[in-house]
Amino acid sequence: MGAGFHPDLTGRDNVYLNGAILGMTKDEIEASFDSIVDFAEIHDFIDTEVKFYSSGMYLRLAFSVAVHTNPDIFLVDEILAVGDEPFQKKCIAKIQELCSAGKTLAVVSHDLDLVSKICDRGVVLEHGNLRFDGPIKEAVKVIRGGD
C-alpha cells in the first residue's frame, strides 16, 4: 500500500500518481478524488507534501486510494495496526463492503479478532510451510494452540 507515493509531491499529486500506478484513468481518479480525500480525512493537508504527513495520514491516504481503485483482489498487510480506532472501524466497514461486492481479500495480520470478523477462510503458515488451510474459525484455533 502506498507504493508509488513520492515524498516531495503533495497528497493531491500522489493521489493521481498512485491511482495511475494502480490502474485508474485520469477521469476515474478525478471522479473519485473527493471521495478519496473524504475517506482519508485529510482535507486540510491534501495540498501539503506527503513528507510532512504523519505515518497515519500517509497510510490513510494510501488505503483510501487503494480501495477506490475497485480492486477484484485486495491485499491488506497489517494496515489496520496503524491509525486510530474510528479510522480502523471505517476501514473494516470498507473491507466488508468490498467482500459483500464479491471481491477477494487477502489479509496478513496477527490480529485474530480482526481476521475472525472479516475473513471466512484462514491459511496458517509456520516457518514458511503450510500448517492449515480452511475455515477461519478453525485457523484461529490452530494459531491459538487448539489444534
Model-based region annotation:
Residues 65-76:
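A short, proline-enriched helix->beta-strand linker immediately N-terminal to the Walker B motif
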Residues 127-128, 143:
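Conserved ABC ATPase "signature" C-loop
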Residues 109-110:
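H-loop/switch region of ABC-family ATPase nucleotide-binding domains
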Residues 115-117:
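A short, surface-exposed alpha-helical micro-motif characterized by mixed small hydrophobic
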Residues 133-134:
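ABC ATPase "signature
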Residues 16, 20, 28-45:
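Conserved ABC ATPase "signature" region
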Residues 88-101:
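Helical segment within the ABC ATPase nucleotide-binding domain
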